[in-house]
């Protein structure tokens, strides 16, 4: 058997960073079940790699449900420390809207190439799937590797083609929460294929007590875009299911979209009353261009059962109220998650059994966890890579120093 101080399981962002952090003081092996590293990293940000979010740490933490758990790792491995790893190898960064950080080359391959360069003196075993870990005096992995400490960074369960298939959940005695889809496009009950490709800009999406202002992209099967992805995680939290038991989740949820957030309902009613008098000969389909994307108007009018060539002066009070209600609360009935496009896994190894200052299990000594295999998940926009890199670094550092 080969012997190492630390074995890191999983060659994604968290595992790579854990191996880098641990290697300064320890003999490390990185175990990757694929034939190469960083499969999921390569497709993040549409292949451009939205590596982190540049918000100040306090504001960054407020974006997470599990901010108290993440706090120590975020302060231990800051954005500046992360970006300096790449700047020291000649790669700088650009900051785009919503504080999203990308490499200046806009190529995820360049991020991965530098990370691999930091790993050049570390033993890496490819096509190595861990199916068994035994804890004796040390850890025995697949009956052929001995390690004093183990870091599990196997990712989530919702992107199996990249290697994230939930492998890490059953390797230890640490409890696992319900595993759900996160940051996932939504499938609607109504067929939207005729308006696929339309973007609703700067609308307010509402689900129960949660709301967010962002863009909504209409797809052939439903809704996507940053706002939808973020609110999908709230839907997921609200619905009782576990994809390890049943991957096909049926939904009966309703999203409400405020298509005119610059007006409240009374202001819109007043505007309609005045405009319908002053512009009485204008067709409603033309009038709505002031409020809606042009290609969305026929679909919208069909939903309120008003003909597009109806003059404003001929619209009665009931129809006017119906228009106002639809503009302020346009309803989309949701039937399912578009599960094959789930960006992250919601849930994982329960953080109640993890020491947030070290990432060590409180159940099994010398066992650490990092990245998406853990319970926390954040919104879209670089937040989840931030979790991966910071928890990975903290796990690697803690394991090597203990």
Residue ranges and their predicted role:
Residues 158-171, 375-402:
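A conserved FAD-binding loop/helix module that cradles the flavin
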Residues 126, 298-377:
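A glycine-rich dinucleotide-binding beta-alpha-beta segment and adjacent secondary-structure elements
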Residues 46-98:
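Glycine-rich active-site loop/strand segments that organize a redox cofactor
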Residues 7-9, 31, 130, 145-160, ...:
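Short hydrophobic core segments
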Residues 35-37, 42-43, 51-52, 57-58, ...:
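An anion/pyrophosphate-binding glycine-rich loop and adjacent beta-alpha core
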Residues 2-14:
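Beta1/beta-strand and adjacent pyrophosphate-binding region of the FAD-binding site
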Residues 126-138:
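A conserved short coil-to-beta-strand element within the FAD-binding core of flavoproteins
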Residues 7, 23-46:
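Glycine-rich FAD pyrophosphate-binding loop
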